[in-house]
């Protein structure tokens, strides 16, 4: 990129979709993860890349991995399930968007709300976009996330009784909100320090909702339940 920039004078816009795929799928391969993080740091960190990179946009499920307590790429501005900022309406479908879809596809809005609503981001109700689109095209109310690889991967976590985790999950399934400390999570999907780390991971994956004001996690909707 540096050589092309030197020859053409043009800067690049870099887009990486699912930047965290190696963090999730190669969780046990620490060497590969470190090589990948070092690659990203070499590409984006410091003043040198700004000579030839105009903008970098990374999307993924997890926040940028931390090294000890510091972000591996601290020159990025992050928008997450815990802190979506002013991008909250773009994390999924809003109430108004779902109402419009229900009208166009002749669906009962309250039933759609019961199944796929429940995420609370920056005070806004947000719906699971994949599930809503699948409902509109397939015309069946059901759990669409059980068909994904991520769902299979988290089953061992849900079945753990790590630090009382199973009891907390059961409480949430019955409708309870449970307190969670989301700030200790290091984005490490192998070495969970406590049940709060697991719950925070599930919040990032979208399997739990999070009320930032109350600092509590909950089951967001019927699809997850």
Predicted regions and their residues:
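Phosphate-binding site recognition
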Residues: 1-225
């Amino acid at each position: 990129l540096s050589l092309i920039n030197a020859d053409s004078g043009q800067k690049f816009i870099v887009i990486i979709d699912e930047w965290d795929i190696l963090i999730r799928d190669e969780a046990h391969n620490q060497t590969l993860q470190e090589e990948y993080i070092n690659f990203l740091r070499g590409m984006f960190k410091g003043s040198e890349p700004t000579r030839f990179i105009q903008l970098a946009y990374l999307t993924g499920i997890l926040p940028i991995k931390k090294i000890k307590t510091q972000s591996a790429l601290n020159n990025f501005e992050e928008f997450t399930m815990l802190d979506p900022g002013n991008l909250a309406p773009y994390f999924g479908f809003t109430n108004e968007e779902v109402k419009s879809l229900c009208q166009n596809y002749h669906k009962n809005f309250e039933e759609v709300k019961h199944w796929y609503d429940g995420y609370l981001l920056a005070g806004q109700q947000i719906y699971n976009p994949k599930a809503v689109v699948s409902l509109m095209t397939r015309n069946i109310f059901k759990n669409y996330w059980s068909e994904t690889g991520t769902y299979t991967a988290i089953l061992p976590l849900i079945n753990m009784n790590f630090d009382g985790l199973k009891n907390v999950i059961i409480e949430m399934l019955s409708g309870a909100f449970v307190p969670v400390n989301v700030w200790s999570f290091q984005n490490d999907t192998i070495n969970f320090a406590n049940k709060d780390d697991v719950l925070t991971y599930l919040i990032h994956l979208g399997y739990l909702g999070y009320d930032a004001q109350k600092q509590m996690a909950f089951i967001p909707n019927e699809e997850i339940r």
